[in-house]
């Protein structure tokens, strides 16, 4: 069983040494893409990514400094700081959990295509849905083609916890029957009805991935046993290959990297 998540825009700086890094499966393509991105101006980054001048300048600097030297890299699982990674809490995974994750967890990335947890990467900013100025890089779905999907096993269940912007890079090439796509809902205290809350769902996806790894869940039938940060399986709201989990009171507020939008 493979677990899919995606990268976050927020990243942590690479620590100084100590980690044993693996090499991304599609690093040659990532180098090609990064080499192109080094040619873009601050203004082109601002236009393509809809960034403020300050953030565009920072993004330009990230690619100007980008390289593949191990001393400038950190494991992918430790490099991201968005809400999904707040739920994943990679820093608390045991060495045995991380070793298990290396064979199960895959991270979809605009720059690297697909990453294993211990793959060495540098800070960057490139979402899969960005439209870049020049072909063949203008459309990243076309740039990557089926290369990312070919990095996944040919058979077996894929637990899809990635955003649609990212999972499209694999779902269009693989049988839909292979995918299990959990949904995470929060009860509205005013109406008593379940609703989709973006930040809650992102943190829940990370917590779900963490639980699958820590509990060594191998049988897809056991997915319904997830009961972390307030969530419980809700059969009435579930569909085939789309199990629904509902929380009465969200238990992941303390995990979020955000200061708001948690209501």
UniProtKB/Swiss-Prot annotation:
It comes from Salinispora tropica (strain ATCC BAA-916 / DSM 44818 / JCM 13857 / NBRC 105044 / CNB-440). InterPro entries: YaaA. GO terms for biological process: response to hydroperoxide. This is UPF0246 protein Strop_2927. GO terms for cellular component: cytosol. It holds the Pfam family H2O2_YaaD. Coiled coil: none annotated. Disulfide bonds: none annotated. Belongs to the UPF0246 family.
């Amino acid at each position: 069983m493979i677990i899919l998540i995606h990268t976050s825009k927020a990243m942590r700086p690479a620590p100084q040494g100590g980690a044993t890094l693996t090499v991304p499966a599609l690093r040659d393509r990532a180098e090609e893409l990064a080499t192109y991105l080094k040619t873009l101006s601050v203004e082109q980054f601002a236009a393509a990514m809809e960034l403020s001048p300050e953030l565009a300048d920072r993004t330009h600097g990230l690619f100007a400094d980008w390289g593949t030297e191990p001393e400038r890299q950190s494991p992918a699982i430790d490099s991201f700081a968005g809400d999904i990674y707040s739920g994943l809490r990679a820093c608390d995974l045991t060495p045995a959990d991380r070793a298990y994750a290396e064979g199960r967890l895959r991270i979809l990335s605009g720059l690297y295509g697909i990453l294993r947890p211990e793959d060495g990467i540098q800070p960057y900013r490139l979402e899969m849905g960005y439209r870049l100025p020049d072909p063949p890089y203008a459309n990243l779905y076309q740039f990557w083609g089926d290369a990312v999907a070919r990095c996944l096993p040919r058979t077996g269940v894929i637990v899809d916890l990635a955003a649609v912007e990212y999972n499209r890079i694999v779902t269009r090439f693989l049988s839909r029957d292979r995918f299990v796509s959990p949904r995470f809902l929060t009860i509205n205290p005013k109406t008593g009805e379940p609703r989709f809350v973006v930040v809650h769902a992102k943190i829940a996806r990370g917590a779900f991935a963490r639980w699958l790894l820590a509990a060594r869940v191998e049988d897809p039938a056991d997915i319904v046993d997830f009961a972390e940060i307030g969530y419980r399986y809700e059969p009435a709201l579930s569909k085939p290959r789309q199990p629904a989990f509902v929380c009465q009171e969200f238990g992941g507020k303390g995990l979020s990297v955000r200061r708001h939008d948690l209501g």
